[in-house]
Amino acid sequence: MANVTLSSVYKAFGEAVISRDINLEIDDGEFVVFVGPSGCGKSTLLRMIAGLEDITSGELLIGGKRMNEVPPSERGIGMVFQSYALYPHLSVAENMSFGLKLAGVKKAEIYQRVNQVAEVLQLAHLLDRRPKALSGGQRQRVAIGRTLVSEPDVFLLDEPLSNLDAALRVQMRIEISRLHKRLERTMIYVTHDQVEAMTLADKIVVLDAGNIAQVGKPLELYHYPANRFVAGFIGSPKMNFLPVKVTAAEPRQVQIELPNHQRVWLPVEGDQVQVGANMSLGIRPEHLLPSSASEVTLEGEIQVVEQLGNETQIHIQIPAIRQNLVYRQNDVVLVEEGATFSIGLPPHRCHLFREDGTACKRLYQELGV
């Protein structure tokens, strides 16, 4: 096992900058997820750790040793790709042992490692089968098993579940989580799927256009996003944003004026907030309330109703702003498109963002954080 340290890592292809000043510490045995939209540089960052891409500048340490010039085979890493990359003419056992044979490992040790890993991944009864006789989930487990038998210090997983259907993704998420708890090895996982990030990670690294937007535990990012990008990326449906103006500011609260001219005090730090400033109020769809449950309300016209069975998502057009607000409520809500609908804003659940996108620190203590 090993910790991973990236210090001022910078990557460019010609004039195209992919990673900018990446500073990150990944602890020994930690499960870290790189998440972000397409093109944010998350896979390139993983490939630099693996040694498949050169680092333009900066330093990479694995287990305290500089790895910039060390070839991939000597870094003590194992990598699982989006594509399973299994040899179709070889059995499961032969696929899992292929790398060990090339490395000159003795047959008895190969047999022991393959069978041990097969038991862990519930593949023991499939060792004689070829890939064409396996399901997608089984093939992915074989690809993971091929990495496990090499006994790496650090596991790198590049969108390993993206080729699976929804049911298999859920199953494999659970299996990967159990595997990490059992092995206690350092794992670095790349995905664009925030559900995978939230459910698997000890720590999430949110990337935006080659920069680290925020690093933190899943619930920290959900409840206390450092900026508007993270607030809008983490959570589904994404956070609602409203244009507001600051009408008063104190050290531990800020008063803002909503688009309907209501004024409300928010429990956020106000030391660096200027009266008269234009800001954005953010609130998650699941934190909105029925209008009867809050003194602060907004009224609008229902544009779309999405009935999901376990919950209802209502898209509401608020006068004086151009975007819809999304209100999410557990269970079925019977309303009609075109009807007038009122929602309540609980001040303690609101976020406040400056014009540059940075967040004012929330002072309300959320559970589990």
Curated annotation (Swiss-Prot):
ATP binds at residues 36-43. It comes from the Bacteria. Residues 4-234 form the ABC transporter domain. GO terms for cellular component: ATP-binding cassette (ABC) transporter complex, substrate-binding subunit-containing; maltose transport complex. Transmembrane segments: none annotated. It is found in: Cell inner membrane. It comes from Yersinia pestis. Its main location: membrane. It is a peripheral membrane protein. Part of the ABC transporter complex MalEFGK involved in maltose/maltodextrin import. Responsible for energy coupling to the transport system. InterPro entries: AAA+_ATPase, ABC_transporter-like_ATP-bd, ABC_transporter-like_CS, ABC_transpr_MalK-like, ABC_transpr_MalK/UgpC-like, Mo/tungstate-bd_C_term_dom, NA-bd_OB-fold, OB_MalK-like. The complex is composed of two ATP-binding proteins (MalK), two transmembrane proteins (MalG and MalK) and a solute-binding protein (MalE). It catalyses: D-maltose(out) + ATP + H2O = D-maltose(in) + ADP + phosphate + H(+). The keyword Cell inner membrane applies. Its EC number is 7.5.2.1. The gene is malK. This is Maltose/maltodextrin import ATP-binding protein MalK. GO terms for molecular function: ABC-type maltose transporter activity; ATP binding; ATP hydrolysis activity. It is an enzyme of class 7 (translocase).
